[in-house]
Amino acid sequence: MRITRREFAMMTGAAVLAPSLPVRAESANIFVPGFNLPANLDPHQVLDVSETDYALNTYDHLYRWEDNPAKMRPWLAVSYTASSDGLTWDFKLRHGVKFHDGSELTAADVVYSVQRLLGLNKAPSAPFQTVLRPDSVSAPEPDLVRFKLAQPFGPFFSTIPMIAVVNPRIVKAQEKDGDWAATWLASNEAGSGAYRLIASSYVPLERAELERSADHFMGWKDNPRPIAKIDWRPAQVTSTRVLALLNGSLDMTDSNLPVDQVERIQKAPNAHIAKNPTMRLLLIRMNNTKPPFDNINARKCFAHAFNYDGFINEIVKGYATRNAAPLPNNIWGYPKDEKGYDYDLTKAKEYFDKAVAEGAPIKRPIELHVQQPLEQTVQAGQLFQSDLATVGVNLKLVSDTFANLTSVSSKPDTTPDMWIHWVSTYYVDPDNWIGQMYDSRFHGTWKASCWYTNPKVDALLRKARSLVEQEDRAPLYEEVARMIVADSPDIWIYNHIEVVGIANRVQGFRHCPVGSGGEVRWMHLTA
């Protein structure tokens, strides 16, 4: 039975009750965010928005993305030089930077951090694995870091803010059996950032307290009333977060608010909505190694069965723009003439019949994993389920978590049939999206979890990655984007307009596509 749009708009995903939130003392200089904590706290192991938010507050980087549109700002480094062939990069460090234990941060610490990042070989290292070796990073002087790339890498400078610098004296002391202290740093902190973790406060996925580092090297002149403490208490249910914001026990929500919750906040006297364009794609992954998704007609059936405009206009209420290709429509390299797949159930049925005729098991129950705490993924799944039923597809929705999905998607046989997620901005370059998602070299990472393989696509993406000049790279990304769309390995839905609920007492919020405005050092509280 089909549901009406009105009935669908009233649906919300059931969710697990979140831990109760404390009532905040309005006079306390304590900021209480409600966005998620990362699966673990190690910036060299986890790559998602939650980890980026956490690392921006507790760790430092050579350069940092700031503001919207995002711009690179010198941070630990004061300057850099690059050789004409794009292979040698020197970063000059500022003096007097201290880790949270009081020891001085030097170039050798940056070298160790890069070597640890590469050695762990987790998702944050993916952009560097083909161009950096542990011995290709050196410290010729105490304040000079040198990178010698194995080959030219166009996105290299834009990826530099992904390298969080850790304190090797702290980390090495916690190593066990050559594990790079991965277990220890998953629940501790060894940084130099504007805030430091109170380790005793940390409860995985439930709570973390951070206190201001008064002697942070950037100083606090640009914020004379900085927040003294961050009491990070995520609630697993969106409506719980919003209720906490409205009753004064929470200062900020996540940026995945469904429209009904946006409207609640807009009517509140003590909170408001911050609305910012960004570069964040919502897509549905199809496991191209699992029948029926190894059949292009089956994939095109699904691509034509999603109601893109209905979802964007009726469910998201215009807080997004249609994005028909696998990179944001507001970045260079996007093919402006690419229309992608339209919502057409007649076409979907035609492709369904072709897939059946070719022996694809498209009539079997298909599982779509949604992120239960994020209602928008549930809403998208319910809409898709309804329309696919009219075509003849039996879609089952499975509640899951991002942490689990990124883990199981490391192998094709454990990756779900389908799953829905966002791809956020970790570095501002087309490679952050199309390169990491569709070059088969990155199979085993969550970004490449559709397990798509096309040798011609691989070759073009690698060529684009090897060039330095944007004007040479952009046409290649446009070409390869069209090729990928023609193969229909995934379902690209929208580019996000981020909406965040913020208490009126919070001032100084600065949005950036990298981290979604989670950097607290700019903020202050009026009460």
Indicate where each model-derived feature is located.
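Gly/Pro-rich hinge or "lid" segments in bacterial periplasmic/extracellular proteins
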Residues: E66-N68, I163-R225, K229-D231, T346, ...
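Surface-exposed binding/hinge segments that line
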Residues: K92, P127-Q174, R196, S201
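Append "and occasionally in soluble cytosolic enzymes with long acidic Gly/Pro-rich linkers
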Residues: I198, E206-H216, D294-S386, T390-V391, ...
